[in-house]
From Swiss-Prot:
Protein name, UniProt field: UPF0182 protein MAV_4137
Bilayer-crossing regions: 18-38, 63-83, 113-133, 175-195, 210-230, 254-274, 287-307
PANTHER family: UPF0182 PROTEIN SLL1060
Membrane association type: Multi-pass membrane protein
A cellular component annotation (GO) from this entry: extracellular region
Family, per entry: Belongs to the UPF0182 family.
Length: 993
């Protein structure tokens, strides 16, 4: 029976077609409109920053890749369909029960839609996916050599970093395109009758056979190419159960030959498949494909498994030693841990020290950090917030400056930003929120080695930071009492002010000043932003675009927006850097610094790879997670890398948002490639001013990755490495409230890199022995301009207490626990332990220092800011304890040891009501003794007391006597009871008339 006439589809009316077109237009506008608006806004924003070339380069690259990939994949699929249609049988037998006939009629009635629409849809999807790989393509086009060859194939590492990923991408797209063309060709031949399944055997036309066989042969050829490329990827492969990365004995001696054998078999199979073009018998290509499948199972999987089990496992350490050595060398190269960077020195760790030796370590003892930046933020808020809408982050930053005597000191620093979430009531009105409350005001720095007065009780007026302030004062002038002069303390850009969904401020003169700035005793003073940053929104087009961008009609109707108005948005410093340098991974820590009288945010940027041969693959999220990151939710991105360089230092001006990128690593091939992709965007290292260099610090995230790798890759001997017996561990944070690794600490101490007593700003970490709590090493990374980036590892033999053991010894010492029990008053006051610092002192000793904070009440209320109340130390097995560093050092080493330590003076003015006096500091407390009792203040001159006050004064004297007696006897319970009597008596005295 002949083919039935083609069934006609019902025609749409003109009105229906118009309605459908309108509906499709609305849908397209809804889908594309927001993207077009975002693209236009980004174009404006990048232009305002001076990085429009970055935006245009990325956009053009994505578009070109989209076109090429779409045309390639769509074109191949179209060719498969077109050839199948053109070679279809002229006459196709059919009957009324043939289900294919209905599909054939449908396709023929919409032939243009199917033949063009399907390839276009597939091409669009392929292009959309491909454009996301623009980074890989740009690196292929601009990548260079590393100058290092891999140990197996002798290829420069630039091949693995820049070329191999592109070849893999191209191969994947060709494979997908040919496979889809095969599917399309198969379906087309089936629908048009080239393939018929009726009867027992069915029928296959000659044209269908030739086309399908050709496509299958191409797939097999592509598989042969894949086997060839697989050889190179073995060098970044990790076989399960091995303690190293890269091709091992089994991979080199079994898997690598297997890949070559499989490639040869694939070529033979491809020839067998192509033979079916001229031969009608399809059994030969079928046998070839089955052979390829069986070979991949036997040769590709079975043979390596046999070699692994029989040859390698019984002698694994010896068999793998050569390849372990390769991994050690490559990992050190990839993570910047080579011998020209890392220096190892032996250090006893438990040497005895005299008071004079400790006193001579002035660079260390004079800079012992008492302020924990994760604890003192409430004190900054309490004393320096000023207004409800100003805010300090929960975790402050550490930087260094020269003090007034020219000595290097570390400071806890913070910018006083505006927090939009703290605005209340009418302050949240759109006009107030975005045109009045636009900026923060001030830079606050506190010397980290001292506090303002001694507090013997959390209710006393002492123990809080000394504040050095750069701020706009009540007369409108800049008060510059900070560690460095600052011309402009207003903060329009920062991580706090940007932490909101509506991150924008509208600035610029439109009549009178509108922006809240400061207050005098009689009035509020406003300000108008004068910086260069900001996108103009004075015209109606810009106002309309931003109204759509932020879904806010006030852009159109508010009269506060004038011809001179500008909008500041995308104000997070790290996000700004990531936008203008999309190839960078930024450090999770951003810190403010005064550089050349300007307040800037400093951000560390990393270039990374994930396929460095033989280098260990590391998760940034897990490697950088420590107790601070977990507590403050600042985890690094979940990104796996096998190569990392701190290649860029970036600054963002806190006033006008200017982003500047500086080349930090002049040897990094990845950075060199990106500097060719985006010429002129990264300034050379020589442009880093000396003032900026003084505030660059070794980045935390990089250091945490490196210390985790040094735990393994400090081992030189491959057999020892395989046994893991000499590995180290990153210590857990000993604080009982912590749940992760101990963070590294920035400190100013004696110069470990130069091995002398000069002051050095460094990032440090202790390292434990593998699965034990004893110290194995001490790591210091220098941030000094002259020795920046040099890592010194002090290796410690013997059983020296690690952080956990030191913390346990300090917190369980009888004198310490008894004294803190009295201060805590049965949990009425909260005791918090600060960061446990590990400091090399003397001639081979290690000093542990742990500040103790207390706050009134058992909660974390903002008003209950913590005060430094004690300093605890441990040296070898001895505990030092007291209200000051000097007292604790004296208790440990004897008189004179703390001569260089900061001398904290007693708080002036006595104690507030219901508190023991603050003007009588307790001396150091040695283990096994309790602190002496502080006497109440004695009025100056002749004073006549009322009978009631005189009686209470006798109670005070009796309580003091009881406390002294208990102290002499070592009766801690009696001592605590006497102190409580004393506290009650003082309260009664102050309330008695």
């Amino acid at each position: 029976m002949g083919m039935r006439p083609t069934a006609r589809m019902p025609k749409l009316t003109r009105r229906s077609r118009i309605l459908i077109l309108i509906a499709l237009g609305v849908i397209a506008l809804l889908l594309a409109g927001p993207r077009l608006i975002d693209a236009y806004v980004d174009w404006l924003w990048f232009g305002e920053l001076g990085y429009r070339s970055v935006f245009s380069t990325v956009l053009v690259t994505r578009f070109v890749v989209f076109l090429i990939a779409g045309l390639l994949v769509g074109g191949i699929v179209f060719a498969g369909l077109a050839v199948a249609y053109r070679t279809r049988p002229v006459f196709v037998p059919s009957n009324d029960n043939d289900p294919v006939a209905r599909y054939r009629a449908l396709v023929l009635s919409r032939l243009r839609l199917v033949s063009i629409g399907v390839p276009v849809a597939i091409g669009l999807l392929a292009g959309i996916i491909a454009q996301s790989y623009w980074v890989r393509i740009q690196l292929f086009l601009h990548g260079g050599d590393f100058g290092i060859k891999d140990p197996q194939f002798g290829k420069d590492l630039g091949f693995y970093a820049f070329e191999l990923p592109f070849y893999r991408l191209l191969l994947s797209y060709l494979f997908v395109a040919v496979f889809l063309a095969f599917v399309a060709n198969l379906l087309a031949h089936y629908i048009f009758g080239g393939i018929r399944l009726s009867g027992r055997t069915g029928a296959l036309s000659r044209s269908a056979r030739i086309q399908l066989v050709t496509l299958v042969g191409l797939l097999v050829l592509l598989k042969a190419v894949a086997y060839w490329l697989d050889r190179y990827e073995l060098l970044s492969h990790t076989r399960g159960g091995k303690p190293f990365t890269g091709a091992g004995y089994t991979d080199i001696n079994a898997v690598l030959p297997a890949k070559l054998i499989l490639m040869a078999i694939a070529l033979i199979c491809a020839a067998a498949v192509f033979s079916a073009i001229t031969m009608r018998d399809l059994r030969i290509p079928a046998i070839g494909l089955v052979l390829l499948l069986l070979s991949s199972l036997i040769v590709g999987a079975g043979w390596p498994l046999i070699v692994e089990q029989i040859s390698v496992k019984p002698n694994a350490a010896q068999k793998e030693s050569e390849y372990i050595s390769r991994s050690i060398t490559a990992t050190r190269q990839a993570y910047g841990l080579t011998s020209d960077v890392v220096t190892y020195r032996n250090y006893t760790g438990d040497a005895q020290a005299t008071a004079q030796q400790v006193a001579d370590d002035r660079a260390t003892t004079s800079n012992i950090r008492l302020l924990d930046p994760t604890i003192v933020s409430p004190a900054f808020t309490q004393f320096q917030q000023g207004k409800n809408f100003y805010y300090f982050p929960d975790q402050l930053s550490i930087d260094r400056y020269l003090d007034r005597n020219g000595a290097l000191r570390d400071y806890v620093v913070a910018a006083r930003e505006l927090n939009p979430d703290r605005l209340i009531d009418n302050q949240r009105d759109w006009i107030n929120r975005h045109t009045v409350y636009t900026h923060g005001n001030g830079f606050i720095a506190s010397p980290a080695n001292t506090v303002r007065g001694i507090a013997n009780d959390p209710n006393q007026n002492g123990g809080y930071p000394e504040f050095l302030v750069n701020v706009v004062g009540a007369n409108g002038n800049v008060v510059s009492d900070g560690p460095a002069p600052l011309d402009q303390p207003r903060v329009y850009f920062g991580p706090v002010i940007s932490n909101t969904s509506a991150d924008y401020a509208i600035v610029g003169r439109n009549g009178a000043d509108r922006e809240y700035d400061y207050e005098t005793s009689t009035e509020t003073k406003n300000y108008t932003y004068t910086g260069l940053g900001g996108v103009p929104i004075g015209d109606w087009l810009s106002r309309s675009v931003f109204a759509a961008k932020f879904a806010e009609r006030n852009f159109l109707f508010s009269n506060v927006i004038g011809s001179n108005s500008k909008i500041l948005f995308n104000r997070d410093p790290a996000r700004r850097v990531e936008a203008v340098a999309p190839w960078l991974t930024t450090d999770s820590s951003v810190y403010p610094a005064i550089v050349n009288k300007r307040l800037v945010w400093i951000i560390d940027g990393y270039t990374t790879l994930d396929n460095y041969p033989y280098s260990e693959l590391t998760s940034l999220e897990s490697a950088t997670a420590d107790s601070n990151e977990v507590a403050f939710n600042k985890l690094a991105p979940d990104k796996r890398v096998s190569y990392i360089r701190n290649s860029v230092k970036a600054t963002v001006d806190a006033y006008d948002g200017t982003v500047t990128l500086y080349q930090q690593d002049e040897q990094d091939p990845v950075l060199k490639a990106w500097m060719q992709v985006f010429p002129g965007t990264v300034k050379p290292k020589s442009d880093i001013s000396p003032e900026l260099a003084e505030h660059l610090r070794y980045p935390e995230d990089l250091f945490k990755v490196q210390r985790m790798l040094l735990a393994k890759y400090h081992v030189n001997d491959p057999v020892t490495f395989f046994s893991t017996s000499d590995f180290w561990d990153v210590p857990l944070d000993p604080n009982p409230t912590a749940s992760s690794y101990q963070p590294p600490y920035y400190i100013v101490a004696k110069n470990i890199a130069k091995n002398d007593n000069s002051s050095s700003y460094q990032l440090t970490s202790a390292m434990n022995r593998f699965k034990r709590d004893y110290l194995a090493a001490y790591i210091s990374a220098s941030s000094d301009p002259a020795t920046y980036g040099r890592i010194t590892v002090l290796t410690i033999p013997g059983q020296v207490n690690g952080p956990k053991l030191a913390n346990n010894a300090i917190t369980t010492d009888p004198a310490v626990s008894q004294d803190l029990g009295v201060i805590g008053r049965d949990n009425q006051n909260r005791i918090r332990w600060g960061n446990l610092l590990t400091l090399p002192v003397g001639q081979g000793g290690l000093l542990y220092v742990e500040p103790v904070y207390a706050s009134p009440g058992a909660s974390d209320a903002a008003s209950s800011y913590p005060r430094l109340i004690r300093v605890a130390m441990m040296y070898n097995d001895k505990i030092g304890y007291g209200p000051t560093v000097r007292d604790a050092l004296t208790g440990l080493f004897g008189p004179g040891a703390g001569a260089a330590a900061t001398n904290i003076q007693p708080t002036e003015g006595g104690a507030p009501a219901a508190s023991p006096p603050a003007n009588a500091p307790a001396p150091a407390v040695t283990p096994g003794s309790a602190p002496p009792v502080a006497a109440p203040p004695v009025p100056d001159g002749s004073v006549t007391l009322s009978p009631a006050k005189a009686a209470v004064l006798q109670e005070i004297q009796a309580a003091i006597g009881a406390a002294k007696d208990a102290q002499k006897k070592g009766d801690f319970a009696g001592y605590g009871a006497a102190l409580q009597r004393l506290d009650d008596a003082i309260t009664k005295y102050n309330n008695t008339k």
